[in-house]
Amino acid sequence: MKSDSPKTFHVKSFGCQMNVYDGERMAEMLGAEGYVPAADGADADLVVLNTCHIREKAAEKVYSDIGRLKRDDGSTPTIAVAGCVAQAEGAEIARRAPSVDVVVGPQAYHRLPELIARAERGEKAIDLDMPAESKFGALPKRSGNQRPTAFLTVQEGCDKFCTYCVVPYTRGAEISRPFADLIAEARALVAGGVREITLLGQNVNAWIGEDAKGRAIGLDGLIRELAKEDGLERIRYTTSHPNDMTDGLIVAHGEVDKLMPFLHLPVQAGSDRILAAMNRSHSVESYLKVIERVREARPDIAISGDFIVGFPGESEADFAATLDIVRATRYAMAYSFKYSRRPGTPAATMDDQIDEAVMNERLQRLQALLNEQQQAFNEATVGRTTRLLLERKGKREGQLIGKSPWLQSVHVTAPGLAIGDMIDVRITSAGPNSLGAEPLMAIA
């Protein structure tokens, strides 16, 4: 590389949607510093691994990726490990992987340029602070997006302290971004071509703020204000906690046309005994009541969930109760995982840790039921007309892929249309993970 060539960077994000958002913000920040993006880490001058610590497998994958960055001549790029693994393991990362130059937690990544500068001077630059001031004010303003959809972090951190979860320790206490900042960022995204925004938070429905008139509002109020923005066609939010599904938010699902009929509401288990051990602070009955009320407000809503199988002490009867809540809820989709023992969490030292073989067998049974429900939900859409936002090209000539209001991928052959267009379609076929459709008419 010539000395006057701009330095290149590659950001690889693991895990949740908020990590995707954080990765995009880091990329924007590096772009403002004169770096240009590289397609992958093989030839980049700087590689940022934006990590996830929710499960052991995701955390260990980071070290595998670090090892693969070593080049044939023995050199490595400047390597920065960001995100929740960085926060949880800190200097241990640099000890295990000496090629790592920068370790930065999720609340300090706005300092990434100065940490890189320190690394280039030969220092091991580590910043795990959780500063009181908001990192968001230090980030560059949002620019053109190139895609019709975008994430917008409105809330970070969690105060729930579920006994299996590292998020309160890696992301910190719950904070809500100011209303005015969120409206400004949303407007910048829409000006850059975004038509759908997903509001993000570890506990997104705990967001609170004050509107332009100084009135206290919750997430439902923010959604109603965003819905007034011309050019913004769709609004989603994730991830929610059952205890923070307020009356106002439930009502908004029935009243705000731009709020998509989709709700991701994790329950994790169907046994009150296990929910108590998890410190979920809700019961099976209260969860099902929320689902009932949401469906009363928006009958066509798609419900998504999260499940953990094999939590310490889970009996066969407890697991059977999880299958029961799945049958009662009728999920459109759901994510299910084996319990992952995370150091530092209360569940890691609980008695009656479940054997791996038992967890595997239970996970297979749960996923079979969830897959059956997902297929049934998809098949129920066949013959319906709906509106798609076209997001990317398909594999076939003239084929585009969009998202339905219920978050399914929909394949449609629509010559003359482009990514970012909206189109009315009729659903013609349903698979386990996607739908097929025929176009009816384009919408400007």
Swiss-Prot record:
[4Fe-4S] cluster 2 binds at residues 158, 162, 165. One of its GO terms (molecular function) is N6-isopentenyladenosine methylthiotransferase activity. Binds 2 [4Fe-4S] clusters. One cluster is coordinated with 3 cysteines and an exchangeable S-adenosyl-L-methionine. GO terms for cellular component: cytosol. It catalyses: N(6)-dimethylallyladenosine(37) in tRNA + (sulfur carrier)-SH + AH2 + 2 S-adenosyl-L-methionine = 2-methylsulfanyl-N(6)-dimethylallyladenosine(37) in tRNA + (sulfur carrier)-H + 5'-deoxyadenosine + L-methionine + A + S-adenosyl-L-homocysteine + 2 H(+). Keywords: 4Fe-4S, Cytoplasm, Iron, Iron-sulfur, Metal-binding, S-adenosyl-L-methionine, Transferase, tRNA processing. Its cofactor is [4Fe-4S] cluster. Pfam families: Radical_SAM, TRAM, UPF0004. [4Fe-4S] cluster 1 binds at residues 16, 52, 84. It comes from the Bacteria. It is found in: Cytoplasm. Its EC number is 2.8.4.3. Belongs to the methylthiotransferase family. MiaB subfamily. NCBIfam families: miaB-methiolase (TIGR01574), MiaB/RimO family radical SAM methylthiotransferase (TIGR00089). Monomer. This is tRNA-2-methylthio-N(6)-dimethylallyladenosine synthase.
